[in-house]
């Protein structure tokens, strides 16, 4: 494995601001950017106006994320005029798209650094070069390198942490741009993953979320071969670790071995995010998802049989090209059959460079929105019903801090990922406590520590 390039010659030290759009992988990338800059002596600020360096870590999964970047870059023009020494950097998946970096440079010539996802680890070097030579940098690395280990990381949370176990994706769903911007699947060795988790535990962390675009593909590129089920069992034996979660799973790769590992490993939380995208086999085929409705429901049945108290969540795309009313009704019926605890629902958004962008049978926007509203209504009704079942139960909660809505209450999550606001002792923050659920709300639970 490569080691991170180290620089110690940045002249003037100042404050930096990072804004992040997108998934948990992007969040962890931003934590690494922050870690690298803090190692160089920079201080993080939450105010753009105070920053000497502003970094936008971008997402391109949906058009809305890109529009936010354009809008925010426009706002920075005024800041740059007031402070010509301000350094503005743009990185992330959006920049990795073909021609996008050049487009950003043309529209926003005041941007100083534009890099992609594959050379993020060299950011301190690029920053140093810009400051020394009074120049701008546009460097998009087309091909991914081997995994960079031992990068400094500045984690936002002091008790829960993301640990990336693999990068990239080999699935090429017809609507998705991730394989083009994140590269092919590359797995970290189990030893490196274990070492990172052990270090986190020594720093007081209680809960780890194993991250990957498709964690169920973990280890296929390693020699000797290691499966995701193997990794889960290894991680479960680490002393001091309280909880383990993972995301995201691809249904086609969620094997019986993985389901069995979740069921028998006591530190594995009873929560699985299993994106279905559509309940129609016809649409799933057009999406290139490599499973049909029957296969997906079979996987769900196995999960519920071995993990009866499991909380399932999913992703659903509404209005994929060619989606008929019949296809949409099949999605609704699948949602009702599975009874998800929660679902992330999205309107289909054309992504340039993906096969689906060229499909001719695009669904009208008004039809998409009507279907979307119908779906959300069903999802919310089921979520409320699932939450209601917690009333009167005693649940283990990892206490994360005070409630955002009531400073007199604490907040945390159950093993199934339910948000709980409850009356309790502030000395419990950072600990696992038992909470009696006294009331179920639409998107959270209310309780009291016992």
UniProtKB/Swiss-Prot annotation:
It catalyses: N(6)-dimethylallyladenosine(37) in tRNA + (sulfur carrier)-SH + AH2 + 2 S-adenosyl-L-methionine = 2-methylsulfanyl-N(6)-dimethylallyladenosine(37) in tRNA + (sulfur carrier)-H + 5'-deoxyadenosine + L-methionine + A + S-adenosyl-L-homocysteine + 2 H(+). Residues 155-385 form the Radical SAM core domain. Binds 2 [4Fe-4S] clusters. One cluster is coordinated with 3 cysteines and an exchangeable S-adenosyl-L-methionine. GO terms for cellular component: cytosol. Its cofactor is [4Fe-4S] cluster. InterPro entries: Elp3/MiaA/NifB-like_rSAM, Methylthiotransferase, Methylthiotransferase_CS, Methylthiotransferase_N, Methylthiotransferase_N_sf, MiaB_methiolase, rSAM, rSAM_horseshoe. [4Fe-4S] cluster 1 binds at residues 23, 59, 93. PROSITE patterns: MTTASE_N, MTTASE_RADICAL, RADICAL_SAM, TRAM. Residues 14-132 form the MTTase N-terminal domain. PANTHER family: CDK5 REGULATORY SUBUNIT-ASSOCIATED PROTEIN 1 (PTHR43020), MITOCHONDRIAL TRNA METHYLTHIOTRANSFERASE CDK5RAP1 (PTHR43020:SF2). This is tRNA-2-methylthio-N(6)-dimethylallyladenosine synthase. The gene is miaB.
